[in-house]
Structures are given as C-alpha cells and as structure tokens.
C-alpha cells in the first residue's frame, strides 16, 4: 500500500499516511520482534519529516493538522530494526539517509559501508545497494 502512495497526489498520500501509521503501529504492538514493522515505521517518519514546505503547506490546507514525522524517531525505529535483523540491507539505506538528514554524515557513511558489505537479496534492495555505493564513491572523490 505504501509503495502505491508515492505516485499519488499529496492529498491521497496524507490520507494514506494516516492509514499506514495506524496499521504499522498495530503491527509493532502485535509483532514487537519483527524488524520489518520497525523499518516501515522508520520510513513513515522519514518520509513525513522530509515532506517539502509546499507539500506540508498544502496538507495544512486540506487537513487541520497533517501527520508529523520525525527524523529522530525514524532513527530509533531503524536502529531497532537493525538490532532485530542485522542482515537487511534496506534498513541500512534508510538509516544512512536519516543520518544524512540530521547532519551526522560520518555515521551515514559508516552505515552505508556496512550496508554495501551485505548481499542484496531482492531487486528493490539492489537499488539501495547501488545508491549507497554511489554515495560512498562521491565521498571518496571529495577526499581526493
């Protein structure tokens, strides 16, 4: 459901975000040892925290108060997800992106390095792998 939202208008995305939050929180409560539940909640917070000013302004017109995301809360969810499943490359990608957003660039690079050491098991994770490699190469070029 969440993947479909990415291509919808902002109104549909915000409405869908509320549904995703509710069901994801229920999943975390019912499956507290499932790393993917924490990953989903981390992405939920990341994406809402990363919502542009224009989109957030539009969301405020449509809704009394749009859902609030937080990079710090996303960080907690991603760290918990990795604690429970240290072999899932997707969480390393999102944790690294979150570190970048909060200005912890060295931590982001360290997480990306750990992530690229894992083998990408699925096509979507292959995209995460390639993006992390690209970021690391760009950083290496800056150093030289």
Question: Language-model features: where?
Answer:
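Structural register within alpha-helical repeat arrays
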Residues: 1-4, 41, 95, 102, ...
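Short coil/linker segments at helix-helix boundaries
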Residues: 1-33, 43-83, 121-127
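Register position in tetratricopeptide repeats
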Residues: 3, 47, 101, 135-138
């Amino acid at each position: 459901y969440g993947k479909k939202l990415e291509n919808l208008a902002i109104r549909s995305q915000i409405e869908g975000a509320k549904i995703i939050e509710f069901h994801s929180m229920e999943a975390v409560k019912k499956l507290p040892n499932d790393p993917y539940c924490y990953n989903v909640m981390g992405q939920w917070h990341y994406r809402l925290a990363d919502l542009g000013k224009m989109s957030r302004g539009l969301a405020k017109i449509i809704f009394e108060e749009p859902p609030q995301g937080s990079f710090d809360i996303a960080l907690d969810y991603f760290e918990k997800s990795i604690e429970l499943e240290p072999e899932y490359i997707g969480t390393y990608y999102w944790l690294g992106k979150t570190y970048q957003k909060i200005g912890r660039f060295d931590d982001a690079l360290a997480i990306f390095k750990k992530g690229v050491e894992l083998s990408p098991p699925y096509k979507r994770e292959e995209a995460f792998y390639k993006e992390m490699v690209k970021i690391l190469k760009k950083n290496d070029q800056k150093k030289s």
